[in-house]
């Protein structure tokens, strides 16, 4: 079941869903709009051979940029972080979607689930499928998070729990 704005406001007022900061225009008809944070990550090198299964840590592959603008080269991607720190209830998951206006410029994100019980800034991959450089601004609404009720409860125990700022991927050594 997708939660409406009334249900979202109720969860926020009860302290079950936390969004900090919470802007007046964040709670929409069927989800939350989240804003671009103050940093992003982009690959530090072009043409490198990346083997996720051989990596303990992928952070050295990325350059973190602190800026008021996010520059996304043509046919490339960046990792963006939300300005908001989100704490999900243990019985609510989120489905992250790019705002449709940005998709019409040629941007996309992969299907992304924000797990029940997740807490932290959300790091999301934004792909520029267009032939043009696209520049986004810090603080603009870019991510629409649709919240859905999960059956039962679960605790999130993932590697990204409590992340702050943009978080490059973990290495997959030992998982492959």
Curated annotation (Swiss-Prot):
DCTP binds at residues 99-104, 115, 163. One of its GO terms (biological process) is dUMP biosynthetic process. Pathway: Pyrimidine metabolism; dUMP biosynthesis; dUMP from dCTP (dUTP route): step 1/2. One of its GO terms (molecular function) is nucleotide binding. Signal peptide: none annotated. It catalyses: dCTP + H2O + H(+) = dUTP + NH4(+). The active site is at 125 (proton donor/acceptor). The keyword Hydrolase applies. Keywords: Hydrolase, Nucleotide metabolism, Nucleotide-binding. Gene3D superfamilies: 2.70.40.10. It comes from the Archaea. Coiled coil: none annotated. It is an enzyme of class 3 (hydrolase). Its EC number is 3.5.4.13. The keyword Hydrolase applies. NCBIfam families: dCTP_deam (TIGR02274). Belongs to the dCTP deaminase family. PANTHER family: DCTP DEAMINASE. Catalyzes the deamination of dCTP to dUTP. Homotrimer. This is dCTP deaminase. It comes from Pyrobaculum calidifontis (strain DSM 21063 / JCM 11548 / VA1). The lineage of its organism: Archaea, Thermoproteota, Thermoprotei, Thermoproteales, Thermoproteaceae.
